[in-house]
Amino acid sequence: MDKDLSLDNLRKKIRSNEFTKATSGYAPGYLQANLVILPALWATDFLLFCQKNPVACPLIDVTQPGERYLPSIGADIDLSRDVPEYHVFYEGNFEASVPDLTELWQDDLVTFVLGCSFSFEEALIQSGLSIRNIDDGKNVSMYDTNIACQPAGKFDGNFVVSMRPFTPKDAIRAIQITTRFPKSHGAPVHFGDPSVIGISDIAKPNYGEAVHINSDEIPVFWACGVTPQNVIRQSRPPFCITHAPGKMLITDRLSSEFAVL
């Protein structure tokens, strides 16, 4: 089965561009990460932005300019090749999706590795909770919101959130479990009425895919590592690269290493 791929085999398939799908449900137990890659002149401001917004942008590590490797997350990880799909922005505008960064890499680029909510999915599943998008074989639903980030330097904007539906009973358990994973966005930022956080139509996510919400379920929203992409569109750095929403870097680190409590 596809989702039974070992981490090594999955990474090989990603690096060879054989695997280009969303990574939710893959490599259970391993920390998945968002990427933001910026010119060094913009890196200090973005580092401050992460420090001021740890729920939306939980910083795992950051590289030196030009470095494509980060031993703290994996000895063999190549940040320019080991994501299923990258998004390229110029002046804050989305320009292209690319399978790797071989032709785009520059010596002044600084890579920020940010935690992802996919990392706590195994803990939810092991506790007996079902995750709708994984069960349906879909990417997670993600939405722009009216929740403001704390501005820092050149960077400002609003949260993006991911959504998973649960019954009220299961939602309480999900809150308890995910609180243990602050480096994967931690506890939800909202549950219930989507309009309170500026979502007008829950059936039309801004990123990812829609999932069905049963009549006895409520939507539960976590901060999402697509937030920087929203901020980039507003802050307009001259050049930026990110992961494609839902298509993450899978590290060698276990999610449990970053758990608390």
Swiss-Prot record:
Pfam families, A to Z: D-Glu_cyclase
EC category name: lyase
UniProt superkingdom: Bacteria
Keyword Nucleus: no
Keyword Lyase appears in the UniProt entry: yes
Coiled-coil features, chain-numbered ranges: none
SUPFAM superfamilies recorded: PSTPO5379-like
InterPro entries membership: D-Glu_cyclase, Putative_hydro-lyase, UPF0317
Record EC number: 4.2.1.-
GO MF annotation terms: lyase activity
Alphabetical UniProt keywords: Lyase
Sequence similarity: Belongs to the D-glutamate cyclase family.
HAMAP family: Hydro_lyase
Name of the featured protein: Putative hydro-lyase VSAL_I1435
Taxonomic path: Bacteria, Pseudomonadati, Pseudomonadota, Gammaproteobacteria, Vibrionales
